């Protein structure tokens, strides 16, 4: 478990952020699991149908956090913040952004099926904005901006192939998994 530094009974923000980076490896496992889900959705859309791709992403999305915890456990790593940690509440709030915005994505996709992935990319980008504070990593701002800008660009200028957004998002998440891991590892003293 991460070491929690307390000052006068209150945790410093930087210490709380470091705990999040260390516990979740800078988002490594979560980004990796998410990348796999997005690429599986892209594959389902590319080689079967958009409808199957949508189902894979929506249903798979509900399993991202439990699978992330499983991957962390499998790596012999802590898989959750300690009970009472100040970032637990923010993490829970951030986790609900995507499921609560799914009706919007489904409504948009009902009118413009090719906008399913771009709409979800934009919402995923917004979902990552609080990660900047929670992890104390500006890199999540870059990921967020790339997802939002790409989602808008694909919706407006490149709606075909329909699966492009899924493949691009999977690729970005995969790359940022290793960016986050590197940032988290740089926090660990090498002595």
What are these model-predicted stretches?
Residues 16, 69-84, 126-134, 177-185:
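C-terminal ends of transmembrane helices
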Residues 42-55, 106-115, 155-163:
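Helix-coil boundary and interhelical linker segments in multi-pass alpha-helical membrane proteins
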Residues 1-23:
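Short, Lys/Arg-rich, polar N-terminal cytosolic tail immediately upstream
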């Amino acid at each position: 478990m991460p070491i929690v530094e307390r000052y006068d009974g209150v945790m410093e923000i930087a210490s709380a952020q470091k705990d999040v980076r260390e516990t979740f490896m800078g988002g490594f496992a979560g980004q990796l699991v998410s990348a796999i889900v997005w690429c599986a959705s892209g594959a389902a859309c590319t080689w079967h149908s958009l409808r199957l791709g949508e189902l894979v992403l929506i249903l798979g999305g509900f399993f991202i956090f439990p699978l992330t915890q499983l991957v962390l456990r499998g790596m012999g790593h802590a898989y959750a913040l300690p009970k009472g940690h100040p970032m637990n509440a923010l993490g829970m709030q951030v986790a609900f952004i995507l499921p609560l915005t799914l009706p919007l994505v489904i409504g948009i996709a009902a009118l413009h099926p090719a906008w399913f992935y771009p709409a979800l990319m934009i919402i995923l980008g917004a979902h990552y904005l609080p990660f900047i504070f929670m992890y104390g990593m500006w890199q999540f701002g870059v990921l967020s901006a790339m997802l939002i800008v790409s989602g808008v660009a694909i919706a407006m200028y490149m709606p075909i192939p329909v699966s492009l957004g899924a493949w691009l998002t999977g690729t970005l998440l995969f790359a940022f998994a290793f960016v986050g891991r590197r940032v988290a590892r740089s926090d660990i003293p090498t002595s």
